Amino acid sequence: MEKKPKGTRTGYTTGACSAAAARAATLGLVRGRVPDQVECELPNGQRVVFAVTDGRCEGATAHAVVIKDAGDDPDVTDKARLTADVALLPEAVGAVVLKGGEGVGTITRQGLGLEVGGPAINPVPRRNIEANVREAAGDLLERAGLEVVISVPGGEEIAKRTLNYRLGIVGGISILGTTGIVHPYSTAAFRASVIQAIEVAANQGQDVVVLTTGGRTERFVMNELPQLPPVCFVQMGDFLKYALDTVVRCGLRHVVIGGMVGKLTKIAQGETITHANRNAVDTDLLADIAAEVGAPAEVCADIRNSAMARYASERMEDLGLITAFYEALGRRVIRTLRERYPDRFTLRILMCDFEANKLAEVAEEDSPGLRLSSPLPRGED
């Protein structure tokens, strides 16, 4: 039997595991017994069966644990016990109230898109947890509401090995995941897939490649560039260097990069591998850009003292400087990449917010043929 290549097995996010635990505990309230396994719908629509441990029901509460399997890209949360305690709320019929418990971080600063003082459970996992709980609860929600408490025993210790403290998240880890799937981004297998995808585009006669950092940015640029065939779009993940080195080797003439503020800042500051755990975002750079586009000195100081790229974006939006800020950031990205890859390809940067809404686009002044108001160059299909 042919073995599966090492480094290709995907895993599941803390958000997906939390949703599965919450669903299992909710089923425990409905049926009187927590199941040993549960089928859970991920944010990407995929349905996956998770093993459930330590399931129990005690009166109007139920408890379930899903142990995280990060696949072939184990991070610090691999094997963490994502735990859900679900309790009836007789006075809140139809409500699903989500809370953070032991080992889930608390937000202490603005800039993460989450309420200060609330749990570090990101928006997509929040919606996914609630959707799974509602689906499992069924008619139960016609008689009562449900309180869902997500906890991670040992999460405070795990968080010490993350960048949460720099982001103002204290007391535990974050519950994350936009698709529910952990891809092995740090493996040779994923790097090889990025290289291969660019080679395929070149071999099919394309002279444009559109590089994105993930699923949301890829959907964004696909909507912006509907004239391009799917082969032109490549999710490079964190592997900018491998992607652009392959572009040069294959002789592709045009590169479009789609991204959000965090990854783009890392590219602008010269990072070639943009994984969150490698180096922090340079907020001094963001403060300089904010000053460049006219932000007051006190705002620039706040940005400089923050640890989050998103905070800078939010402050610029409040000031009505969001477009100018992103255009300046895009120019910094082009300048940095041009120093590393002089005259090898044209560059255009497309930028979106965290909901994949377009914020700005910039291109090199010497590449008018790549303006997005007109069709991009396209090779033979």
Curated annotation (Swiss-Prot):
The protein's Enzyme Commission number? 2.1.1.195
Keywords attached to this Swiss-Prot or TrEMBL record, sorted alphabetically, are: Cobalamin biosynthesis, Methyltransferase, S-adenosyl-L-methionine, Transferase
Catalytic reaction annotation: Co-precorrin-5B + S-adenosyl-L-methionine = Co-precorrin-6A + S-adenosyl-L-homocysteine
Q: Which domain of life is it from?
A: Bacteria
Q: Name one GO biological process term.
A: anaerobic cobalamin biosynthetic process
Q: Which PANTHER family match?
A: COBALT-PRECORRIN-5B C(1)-METHYLTRANSFERASE
Name the chain's protein: Cobalt-precorrin-5B C(1)-methyltransferase
Q: Which organism is it from?
A: Methylococcus capsulatus (strain ATCC 33009 / NCIMB 11132 / Bath)
